[in-house]
Amino acid sequence: FPLLAIPFFMLAGNLMSSGGIAKRLVNFFDSLIGHVTGGLGMVTIIVCMFFAAISGSAVATVSAVGAFMIPEMVSHGYNKPFSAALTAAAGTIGVIIPPSIPFVIYGVVSGTSITDLFTAGFLPGIMMGIALMVVCYFVSKKNGYRGKEKASTPAEIWKTFKDAFWAILSPVIILGGIYSGFFTPTEAAVISVVYSFIIGVFVYKELDIKGAYQSFKDAIVVNGATTFMVGFSTVFAAFLTMAQIPNMIAQGILGLTGNAILILLIINIFLLIVGMFVDNIPATIILTPILLPICTGIGMHPVTFGIMLTMNLAIGFCSPPYGINLFVASSISKVSIEELTRKILKPLLALIVVLLLITYIPAFTMIFLNK
């Protein structure tokens, strides 16, 4: 039953992208901070954070926000490779800020409460956004990427807020309902689809039959591939368990050192490397039974491990050679992967700093949980 959330969150993200929600979020946040140094880059990051709270997908976030913001940043003098790299990095927040498709997968595999994972992922997602905004500010200051000539007036801010109100309300309804216990994450995914459809068709009036058809089609195609990955990965994970591979790997890691700090560092490095080559869904299904017992054995809570695992694999989305966010941003911006790779290094380092904070300071993930 929890896996049913995946296709519905995918569909909701597609409907919102086609329904003009991303554009209105951009206009609102641009009116707030578009005038500061690096303002457009920061707007891109914040909109990615909001869109993440709607779609639960990194690729959907990069596609929806990047198509609008990369050309906008370039038109205001931003370096195109940097604009694309920043968007690719910000897209990783899509699987950390709830709702999150990888959290659903991890919750099913590990038996961890999906609602707890959604609650715990909120603060780390915000931390990732802040870290990227700090990078954006200093890079913009160094290269002269200035904001708008003048700040928006209160009347202009109010106008963009009214236009974006229903878009802003969407994550409030979805996450508020989950956190309050009013509905489950799976039910929230269905409500998200209904809400997106109503807003796109009847409020913003930008979602037509063609757009709705394409949204359903894209969701079906992506979910089909996802379902196959889940099926085959589950079988492979069961085979590894029967062959006692998890026990062998655990003994190998624990044989290297008994120091909890070093064990977590080794696991993080391993997961970062895996994330560069393997999609997050099969990686989560295969590696959770192997690594979770090791981490819980040294005192880490399963929720914290789930955030750490997902964040590692998310960073892989924008890491060469096979980071999917890089390819999406490259396709949108027409910038080569080689150019993107050079510009992604600083955002990647910022995300890794947040990862280490999450790993070694459990309060960042457990602060909103009464556990």
List each model region and its residues.
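Alpha-helical transmembrane segments of multi-pass membrane transport proteins
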Residues: F1-K371
